[in-house]
């Protein structure tokens, strides 16, 4: 599993550099720097009032959403395993005039690395598919929350995630549960934002 994590880290380090340029506008970084809220409508609606709440953003990547939480009044910490992503996150915070704490590490290290406890853990879009054990993930989150603290999770339904589009039809392709010792391997030349940059580290494991 360590090998899979390192393979993924190299891929996400490279993606972070590409995403920091945001050539396609997929991450809305220019709009975010200009003061706009870059959260999706579903998150913005469901989160409610978070002013003054201590929030831990898990797998925060380049920190855009972490900073959106700060803009909404939260005291936010972003946690991610990619050093390149966090370099971008800190730079984006400086550019935006927003204060957030960014910590490099894995979720199971959160209680040791982050300044908890927290009122809310926040995790959205394409996160849990990368995790080898959701029980460990849940225990790590519980360990950093105050009594009565909450987890906000927004992601695609697992029933959708097992599908692939083939000949304009969605077909079941993957097992609903992937064995930890046999992660799925994928290879993509480019990242998901539409930027045409060809990546060196193209392989990921989920």
Language-model-derived ranges and their functions:
Residues 24-53:
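Conserved alpha-helix/loop element of class I SAM-dependent methyltransferases that forms part
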Residues 123-125, 154:
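Residues lining the SAM
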Residues 199-206:
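Short alpha-helix
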Residues 135-150:
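A short glycine-rich, Lys/Arg-flanked "PGG" loop and its adjoining helix->strand segment in the class I
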Residues 150-189:
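Conserved class I S-adenosyl-L-methionine
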Residues 54-110:
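Class I SAM-dependent methyltransferase SAM/SAH-binding core
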Residues 112-121:
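A short acidic, Gly/Pro-enriched loop at the edge of an enzyme's catalytic core
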Residues 1-26:
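N-terminal, positively charged/glycine-rich alpha-helical extensions of SAM-dependent methyltransferases
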